[in-house]
Amino acid sequence: MSAHRIRARRITRRNVPLAERCSFRIGGAAQFWAEPRSCTQLRALIEEAQRARIPLSLIGGGSNVLIADEGVPGLMLSLRRFRSLHTQTQRDGSVLVHAGAGLPVAALLAFCAHHALRGLETFAGLPGSVGGAAYMNARCYGRAIADCFHSARTLVLHPVRSRAKELPEVRKNAQDKRGECLGLDGGPFTCSSFQTVFARAGDWGYKRSPFQSPHGVELHAGRRLILSLCVRLTPGNPAQIRKHMQEKIADRISKGQFRFPSAGSAFKNNPAFGKPSGILIEEAGLRGTSCGAAQVAPWHGNLIINTGNATAHQVRTLLRVVRQRVFETHGVWLEREIIFSGESVRMTSSSRDS
């Protein structure tokens, strides 16, 4: 299958701007972009891209991602059309809510409010998609997705055994010396099975889920793609549920989370550090620090904002400055929460930037 045939598919477009699809409003274009409408289309796109030796990546709601200024090579998949939503009432009175990975978190919350289902109120105002929230094990006001997670339907990218002993760099051409298609971890893969993943306590942690990958949005062998999420909720008082949601949204607004484009929290909190990352950053005197149009928010240390036409390079530089200054001040290295995507980001990232 040639790259031309990939482009020719009606659901695939070329050179699609990504800045407008991400909350940071930063980044170049996707070389190829597709929004499959079904699991069949998704599977076909992945397999065709593999045969054509085209790198693959997957983006959720774009609320936690920094796209490289040069854009993203290969085919970027979006599951924004996976928006199914239905419920199952259980014998114990609880309700299982099944939501497609591409459904906006706001739409899921509106559904829960309308049907008086309690358990997700603290996520009111959270940007992004259901799949992205599950992938990150999103945590808001002390409650995480893991607290109500029941199961997720996934597509598994199984590794394909290769005869090659040594594999060349695949970030540029995604193929080995024989032209064999490779996953971005250096091995070929195929999407040969669907799998339902159920809750297991050991698989989850602070901002950690069993779906996460060190490759970020890039697809590779062993990756499980979230197609839909199932959460267990309980019936509640509709007025109280709406009130709780409105309070959380108002609190987010008062904290300036929506004043400028951003990717949310820049760094994860670490209980071992004794203080939230935002406080450590502020104590290092970094509020308002800028690199071009990228700035540490003057009102919140753990928020990097785009004050105008910031570039991904400026954001990455500012992230490095913040980490270095916090280390010099407190002796700890902050862990980045923002996910990097794109060729130059992958090639320039190091453990010190993680």
UniProtKB/Swiss-Prot annotation:
Q: Which reaction equation describes what this protein catalyses?
A: UDP-N-acetyl-alpha-D-muramate + NADP(+) = UDP-N-acetyl-3-O-(1-carboxyvinyl)-alpha-D-glucosamine + NADPH + H(+)
E.C. number: 1.3.1.98
Residue stretches making up the FAD-binding PCMH-type domain: 26-236
Q: Which family does it belong to?
A: Belongs to the MurB family.
GO BP annotation list:
cell division; cell wall organization; peptidoglycan biosynthetic process; regulation of cell shape
Q: What is this protein identified as?
A: UDP-N-acetylenolpyruvoylglucosamine reductase
Q: Where in the cell is it found?
A: Cytoplasm
UniProt KW Electron transport keyword: no
Sorted UniProt keywords: Cell cycle, Cell division, Cell shape, Cell wall biogenesis/degradation, Cytoplasm, FAD, Flavoprotein, NADP, Oxidoreductase, Peptidoglycan synthesis
Per the UniProt record, the source organism is Treponema pallidum (strain Nichols)
Query: Which pathway does this chain act in?
Result: Cell wall biogenesis; peptidoglycan biosynthesis
Which cofactor(s) are needed, names only? FAD
User: What is the top-level taxon of the source organism?
Assistant: Bacteria
Major enzyme class: oxidoreductase
Matching entries from InterPro entries are given as: FAD-bd_PCMH, FAD-bd_PCMH-like_sf, FAD-bd_PCMH_sub1, FAD-bd_PCMH_sub2, MurB, MurB_C, MurB_C_sf, Oxid_FAD_bind_N
